[in-house]
Structures are given as C-alpha cells and as structure tokens.
Amino acid sequence: MATIYKVLIPLPSVDFDPSETSIPWKILKENGYEVFFATPNGKPGSADFRMLTGKGLGIWKPILIAHKKARTAYNEMISDPNFQNPISYKNLKAENFAGLILPGGHAPGMKEYLESEELQKFVGSFFATGKPVGAICHGVVLAARSKLPGTDRSILYGKKTTALLKSQEMAAWNLTRLWLGNYYRTYPQSVEEEVRSALKDPNDFHFGPKPIFRDNHKKLKWGHAITDGNYVSSRWPGDAHSFTVSFMKLLSNR
C-alpha cells in the first residue's frame, strides 16, 4: 500500500493570502498528498477578503486581486473537512507530518501567525527534523523568526532563500496607500530587510527574475523558487505553482 504523505499548512485566524494557500493545497491534493491545517485556536481561518473580492483596491483591482483560478481553488479548499477542522497551534507535533508549508499574506491579521512564539517553536523543531519545509512571501518571515532548538540562530542561517522583494512590497504600498494606508506594509521594516538580517550572509538572499507574470502549471518558468537542502522558498503568489512543484520534489526524494 502506497504511503500517503501528510503536509501541514498553518494559518492565522484571518487575512492569509488565498493564492499562497489554495494553490499549494490543490496541487498537493491532486498529486495524492493529504493536507492538514492549523490555526491559533483550532477554528477555521479565513483569507484576506480584499484579495478575494478586490474591495478597496480601486483601479488596481485587476492586477492586485487573487486570480480567478486561485479564488476557485480557495472556495474548494474551505469545503475540505481538514480545513473545517484545523489543529490548534498548541497541539502540533512534528512527527505527525512529512512536510510543512508556510504561506504568506500582508494584512494586519497575519501578525497573529508571524508573531506566535508557539508556532515559531514548532517551525524550528520541524526544520530540525530535516523534513521538507516550504515558505512563500511573508511565510519566510515566520521561518526567519523561528530558531533551531537550543540555539539563538534562525533556521535560515546558512541557507539560501528568497521572499517578498522590497521592490514588490513598496510598489503595492505606493499604489494604494492614499486610501488603504499601511495595508500592504505589515511592518515598518520590509520582508526582504528582515529576512536578510537573519541570514549568515545577506547575499544568500536571491531576487530571481523580475516578477511580472504569475506562473501557472504550463508556465512554471514564470515563477521563481529557491531550494537549499530541505528548504524551498518563493516570493509572491505569482510563484505559487513553481513553489509547490519544487516542494513536492523534496517530498518525493524522502
């Protein structure tokens, strides 16, 4: 009987990015993986409504909203029994999963996930097992804040990584700040700046090709994913397909 690998996707209660969660979920499910979710309180989470509806994005809605296929995948995902019955952070055990995906999101509700000491401790212990870990966009901030057990060093120290680029973050903020304020600025420090500060060498941060087009299953080269050992990272929703394919390669090599 073939082994069914279990992959965990932790989430905040609200405001996670729908594309960076639902696209990996859908691709993993289609390839025979079982996907579980975790939230702070064990109750189902909900994605950033602006990314789903485009409300408040003004004239930039067509380029900033989650793409239609991602929104469709999200609606499928939230009907999944595992999504409706998430595990609470406090009950997570690394031995129960073969892989871990850390999605992103930029709205204020993400801070609950990014700043959770309980979740950071779990991520650190999971990384130490050598099992596959994937982080995309702000999910790389969670990885950067997580420490290897018994050390004061980030799990990313000595690793090559990418994350949301400062140029991307500032562009989205500048397009919308007149009416949305700091919606696109989760923290005063950019994702790129915080992640680079956690690395052994700031040059271990990889920018990749200019992020113009969103990738898809036929255009994986439009995306960007960096793999270093058991760890794979990507920058934004436009990398989600290539990110997940790279993550699955790590799972299949175990």
What kind of region is each of these model predictions?
Residues C137:
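Catalytic, metal-anchored helix/loop core of enzyme active sites in primary metabolism
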Residues P132-V133:
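Glycine- and acidic-residue-rich phosphate-binding/metal-coordinating active-site segment common to enzymes
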Residues M1-T129, L142-R254:
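Extended, subdomain-level signal for the structured scaffold at the beginning of enzyme domains
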